[in-house]
Amino acid sequence: MTIAITIISSLLFLIVGLVVGSLIFKSSTEKKLAAARGTAELIVEDAKKEAETTKKEALLEAKEENHRLRTEIENELRGRRTETQKAENRLLQREENLDRKDTSLSKREATLERKEESISKRQQQIEEKESKLAEMIQAEQTELERISALSKEEAKSIILNQVEEELTHDTAIMVKESENRAKEESDKKAKNILSLAIQRCAADHVAETTVSVVTLPNDEMKGRIIGREGRNIRTLETLTGIDLIIDDTPEAVILSGFDPIRREIARIALEKLVQDGRIHPARIEEMVDKARKEVDEHIREVGEQATFEVGIHSIHPDLIKILGRLRYRTSYGQNVLNHSLEVSKLAGILAGELGEDVTLAKRAGLLHDIGKAIDHEIEGSHVEIGVELATKYKENDVVINSIASHHGDTEATSVIAVLVAAADALSAARPGARSETLENYIRRLEKLEEISESYDGVEKSYAIQAGREVRIIVEPDTIDDLSSYRLARDIRKRIEEELDYPGHIKVTVIRETRAVEYAK
C-alpha cells in the first residue's frame, strides 16, 4: 500500500513538475519570441532606413551622372557645331578664292590672247625687217668689196687676225695676273715660314778686322822685338807673313795681315815671346812652330765644336779640320764659320717647317761654303772647290748639289738645295751681316743708277735701301704695262752680269699715268 502511495505521489510530483516546466518553458518561449519580434522589427526598421538612404544616394548619383553626361553631350555638340561652322567658313572662303582665281584666269587668258596676237604681228614685222636687212647687208658687202678691193674671205681673215691679237693681249694680261696672285700667295707663305725660322734662330756677329793688337808690359819691349838692326822683327815677319807695326801706340804692337790664320799664329807666337822674355831668331822660330801647332789643334777643335753645335756627326776628320779653318775666313766682314752655322740652323728650321730631312738640311747648310776655307790656296771658285771636297769625302748627293747650286751656278735638284740657297741669302743679306768699303758702296750705287737710266723711256732711277733696291720711274707714254715687266727683267739681267754684290737687289719699275682736266 505504501509503495503504491509512493508511486502515486511520485507520479503526481512528476505531472506537477511537467506542468510547471511546460508553463515556465512557454513563458520563456513567449519572452524570447517577443524579444525576437522586437529585434526583427528593429532590423526591419533599420533595413527600411538604410534602403531609404541607399535609394536617395542612388537617385542623387543618377542625377549627377545624368547632369555630367548631359554637360559632356552639350559640350561635344557645341564643339561640333563650332567645327562645322569653321568648315563652312573655309568652304565659303575657298569658293570666294576660286571665284577670284577664275576671274583672274579669265583676265589672263584674255591678256595672253592679246599678247599672242601682238607677238605674231611683231614676228611678222621682224621677219620682214630681217629680210630687208639681209638684202641691205648683201648690198653693203658688195659695195664694200667694190670699194676696198677685198673679198669677203680676205676681210674675214683681217678681222680674225685683229681678234687673235686682242685675245693674245688679254691672255697675256690674265696670265700675268695669275702669276702675280701665285707670287703673292707664295710670298705670304714663304714670309711666314722665314719669319718662324728667323724667330727660332738668333746668332751674334762681330765684324772681323785685318789687324790684331798684342799688349806689351812696357815700351822697352818694342826695342827687344825689333832686335839688333831689326833682325828679330824681320825673322818674325818672314816666318809668319804678317806685318808688325810698331809706332807711338803705348805698350802695344799691331799685327796686320789679310790671312787670319797667319795673323793668329803671329799673335800667339809674339805673346809667348813677350811672356818668356827671350827674343832672338832661334827662339822666334821655335815659338812660331809651337803657335802653328796650337792653331792647327784649335782649328780641329773649332770644326768639331761646329758639328756638335748643329748636331751633325760622321763627317770625315779631314773635312772637319777644313771646316774649322772657316773660323779664320771672312766674306764682306762676316765670319764664314758663323755664317755657315747660321745657314745650317736656318736650313734645318725651314726643312722642319716643310717636312724635309732636318739633319740632311743642316749638313748641307754647314758645308755649303766649305770651299772658302782653301779657295785662296787652290785655283777655282769656292763653289767648285766645295763640290770637289764634298765629292772627295763621299758626302751625300743632296749636300753636293746644295754646294753647287747655292749661288745659282747649277740647277737645284732637291728641296733642301733650294732651302740652303734661301738660308744663305737670308743670313748674308740681313742688315749688318756684311759690310763693304765706302768707296765700293758708293760706286755700286752709282752703277745701279747708271744701268737703270741707260734704257729708253726711263725718266729717273734711285738706288735705295743701302743699294739693295733700285726704283726706276718710266715715261708712261713710252713704256706700257707689259713693257715695264720686260724692262725690269732686262735691268735685273744686266745687274747680275755687270755688278758684284752680296745678297740680292730688288728692281722696281714704277709707271704712273695722270689724267688732269680743269672745270671752268
From Swiss-Prot:
Assigned GO CC terms: plasma membrane
Main location: membrane
Keyword Transmembrane helix assigned: yes
Domain KH: 210-273
Keyword field: Cell membrane, Endonuclease, Hydrolase, Membrane, Nuclease, RNA-binding, Transmembrane, Transmembrane helix
Membrane topology term: Single-pass membrane protein
Region of interest (Disordered), ranges: 76-127
Cellular compartments annotated: Cell membrane
Superkingdom of the organism of origin: Bacteria
Transmembrane segments: 5-25
Top enzyme class: hydrolase
Pfam families noted in UniProt: HD (PF01966), KH_1 (PF00013), RNase_Y_N (PF12072)
EC number: 3.1.-.-
GO molecular function terms noted in the UniProt entry: RNA binding; RNA endonuclease activity
One GO term of the biological process aspect: mRNA catabolic process
Record PROSITE patterns: HD, KH_TYPE_1
Residues of the HD domain: 336-429
Its biological purpose: Endoribonuclease that initiates mRNA decay.
Family of the protein in this entry: Belongs to the RNase Y family.
Protein name: Ribonuclease Y
